[in-house]
C-alpha cells in the first residue's frame, strides 16, 4: 500500500470515530447506520451470487 492510501484509510477511520463520538448518545442513529451498512453488504453479496450463478 502507498502512503496516500494509508492516509485515506486513516482519515476515514478518524471520521467514523468522530461521528460515533458525536452521536454516541443517539443509539438509534448508530443502529440505523449498522442496518443500512448490513443491507448494502447483503445487496453486494446477492449481486456476487447472481454473477457466479
Swiss-Prot record:
Q: Which residues cross the membrane?
A: 4-23
User: Which chain positions lie within coiled-coil regions?
Assistant: 24-50
GO CC term, one of those recorded: membrane
Protein localization: Host membrane
**What keyword terms does UniProt attach to this protein?**
Coiled coil, Host membrane, Membrane, Transmembrane, Transmembrane helix
Mode of membrane association: Single-pass membrane protein
UniProt KW Coiled coil keyword: yes
Name of the featured protein: Uncharacterized protein Gp-k
Q: What is the lineage of its organism?
A: Viruses, Varidnaviria, Bamfordvirae, Preplasmiviricota, Tectiliviricetes
Amino acid at each position: 500500500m502507498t502512503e496516500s492510501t494509508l492516509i485515506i484509510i486513516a482519515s476515514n477511520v478518524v471520521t467514523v470515530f468522530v461521528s460515533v463520538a458525536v452521536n454516541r448518545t443517539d443509539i438509534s442513529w448508530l443502529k440505523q447506520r449498522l442496518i443500512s451498512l448490513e443491507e448494502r453488504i447483503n445487496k453486494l453479496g446477492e449481486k456476487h451470487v447472481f454473477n457466479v450463478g
